[in-house]
A protein has these predicted regions:
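Bacterial Sec-dependent N-terminal signal peptides
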Residues: 1-34
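Membrane-proximal, proline-rich intrinsically disordered regions
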Residues: 25-79, 125, 132, 476, ...
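C-terminal functional modules
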Residues: 392, 396, 404-534
Length: 534
């Protein structure tokens, strides 16, 4: 049976016909890859289409823009829910599904397979061809997108196929990296990408070869280098407990690089499809399959947060007309109609933020809290408040920064107007007591809770990162599922730690799968903690 890791044996399904020139998956390469309208290989090289064509697919495949149903399985019915941002009103599979920890293997395969099909496979093809033809800028760009995608996959599953991608063992299997090995490779690849892009960023006369294909920065090399530094800082902070020495070293690389990081929201890493609606719009506002999560209501209504109306719409439920209402995860869901009147997402247009200035400042705040050297930052509070300021600016409500940073408001108790069993009362251990206003007298744990709570609000709607940070830190305080169908894997009152390895791996890469479970260091279930989850 063909396995999708076997890049040398399978064709890469690229979006654009020009991208066939990159994959080279056929014996009839010359004839198939000759444009019948007169664009030969020389033409394609001249405007970089031969190398740039696959990048649309890669960029749109990280947070999958189309088809919508694949995004629903890739992210919406897992990380979107586990992050606390969303909950479905639809009792899928007779209400025995991911939302209450009865994991649906048929859904969860897509997290893995879409990453390899849409990003890893075309990225490796571009890297190989760019290396062969002396185009280090395209090689670097593909490496960066590969790291951005695959760290997310590792953060969902743990061990991952990365350094051995395309390397087939004699028994037909492919070997996984442990998560520690994968992170070491991510950092090494960021080193390589930075080395290759630096000459282009330093020389303004270099042609901006990415311009026609770059859905984020329009081909600006300097901004891509800043993104590399910012991504490195994200990954460094991620491993602070698992490998403190490596974390400090990598953070120092990011924080001292002369090009700097993403520090203003005008430079946010936001993928703009330009003509494809963010699938969350369709899933929420057309299909009616997703609504606001209860923690969003508790925090953002409680804080009178100025971003709330940019994130969600007021509900239409008869029991709470005009209110911003969220659904608690893992509840009894007799039918789709009961909670359909709760808050839908506000239209996100064609954009998806994946790494923002706000996140960078919250990373700096945590680094400073850890006692790391953070150039240009005098205090944890300074970086924390700058994170809030950049997030408010990103969402067009920057004028309310002063009032918000001085707010002592608290999250509100959660009330389900349809079932009081789902309520979270005042004084509950699951209801946070932190305010936006910085508490410099608080303990380090309380300060970390403030940082990550505001970071969680600012990351919206990037649920993979939000869920990852919740698992790593325990913040913000979210509400556990009411109905727990994990068969004891997740103790009541606790939370999912990862997603099982995809069924396709058990079926087509059995030896690799067994090695991955060994490297995971625990059972292949949703209760096993990842390497960085200390």
């Amino acid at each position: 049976m063909k396995h999708y890791h076997k890049i040398a044996k399978r064709c890469v399904p690229l979006l654009m016909g020009l991208a066939l020139a990159v994959s080279g998956c056929t014996k009839n390469f010359e004839s198939i890859n000759t444009d019948p309208y007169g664009l030969d290989e020389l033409d394609l090289k001249g405007d970089f289409a031969m190398y740039g064509g696959p990048f649309n697919q890669m960029q749109l495949g990280i947070h999958l823009f189309t088809p919508d149903w694949q995004y629903q399985l890739q992210t919406n019915l897992n990380a979107d829910i586990f992050s606390g941002y969303f909950m479905t009103p639809n009792p899928f599979n007779a209400n025995v599904n991911n939302s209450n920890y009865a994991m649906v293997d048929g859904w969860n395969n897509y997290i893995w397979t879409l990453a390899f099909d849409n990003v890893m496979s075309p990225a490796q093809a571009v890297i190989d061809r760019a290396k062969a033809e002396g185009l280090p800028n395209f090689e670097a760009w593909a490496i960066v997108l590969k790291v951005l995608t695959m760290h997310r996959i590792s953060d969902v599953y743990g061990p991952v196929v990365y350094t051995n991608y395309g390397k087939i063992n004699t028994d037909g299997s492919v070997t996984y990296d442990s998560q520690q090995e994968a992170y070491a490779a991510f950092f090494a690849d960021l080193d390589l990408a930075l080395e290759k892009l630096k000459p282009f960023a330093e020389d303004a006369t270099k042609p901006k070869a990415f311009t026609a294909f770059d859905l984020v920065y329009g081909g600006d090399y300097v901004k891509w280098v800043k993104f590399i530094n910012s991504l490195r800082l994200r990954l460094a902070v991620r491993i602070a407990k698992a490998d403190p020495g490596k974390a400090v070293a990598e953070a120092n690389k990011a924080l001292t690089n002369s090009f700097g990081l993403i520090e203003e929201h005008a430079a946010d890493f936001i993928i703009d499809s330009r003509n494809i609606s963010n699938p969350l719009n369709v899933i929420s506002n057309i299909w009616g399959d997703i609504r606001m999560g209860a923690p969003v209501e508790a925090f953002l209504v409680g804080y009178n947060d100025p971003r709330l109306a940019s994130y969600f719409q007021q509900g239409t439920d008869d029991a709470a007309p005009g209110a911003f209402k969220g659904i608690r995860n893992g509840i009894d869901m007799p039918d789709k109609d009961l909670y359909s009147g709760f808050s839908r997402i506000k239209d996100l247009g064609t954009k998806m933020p994946l790494l923002t200035a706000a996140e960078v400042w919250f990373l700096k705040a945590e680094a400073k809290l850890n006692g790391w050297t953070v150039p240009g930052v005098n205090s944890v509070q300074e970086a924390y408040e700058r994170g809030i300021e950049e997030s408010l600016g990103q969402w067009g409500v920057g004028g309310q920064f002063e009032a918000y940073r001085n707010s002592t408001a608290k999250p509100i108790p959660y009330v389900d107007p349809h079932n009081e069993d789902n309520n979270v009362a005042a004084g509950s251990a699951y209801l946070s007591a932190v305010s936006p206003k910085w508490n410099d007298a608080g303990s380090n744990a309380e300060k970390l809770e403030q940082i990550i709570t505001q970071k969680w609000i600012a990351l919206f709607p990037e649920s993979v990162e939000a869920w990852t940070e919740f698992r790593r830190t325990g913040y913000p305080k979210l509400f556990p599922v009411v109905i727990n169908n994990s068969a004891g894997v997740i103790p009541n009152g606790q939370f999912i730690r990862r997603i099982n390895f995809p069924l396709i791996e058990k079926e087509t890469n059995q030896a690799g799968y067994q090695g991955a479970v060994q490297k995971l260091g625990g059972n292949d279930n949703i209760g096993t903690r990842l390497w960085w989850d200390k």
